[in-house]
């Protein structure tokens, strides 16, 4: 009896560990676009309270009030609307011909059913890289310590002054602890 209990407890611990690990791996990954998103969108990333849509040379941030969504789901909220906001960051004069690639494919996938088609086996990736967003400058987007980060990789003999980012739709913009 003791051995059975120890085995059961061990299996339960293993199951919980695998479940938590699978959950953490599926969070914050780049979803490929196989037709379930608008053509201009290369990848979508779910973040707490919204999503980020990545296009060539542009990020579109879309956020909603998570508490209101939960209240609507729980049939507590009477209003038919949810507070939401979108804004964008566009890399001005970026090269439209740049190559975008996803790397480190996960085993996780989703299927989508739109009004026009069924999209199967949509995969998720850990990293997105846009080569030559500017001449000699690459953009790499990834997660670090549970935060979405991006690096602009400036290759030798490249001009960093090419980089110009225009923000649109936000209420205000400021630096806090040297972060935007």
Predicted regions span which residues?
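Extracytoplasmic/secretory N-terminal segments
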Residues: 22-180
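Bacterial Sec-dependent N-terminal signal peptides
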Residues: 1-27
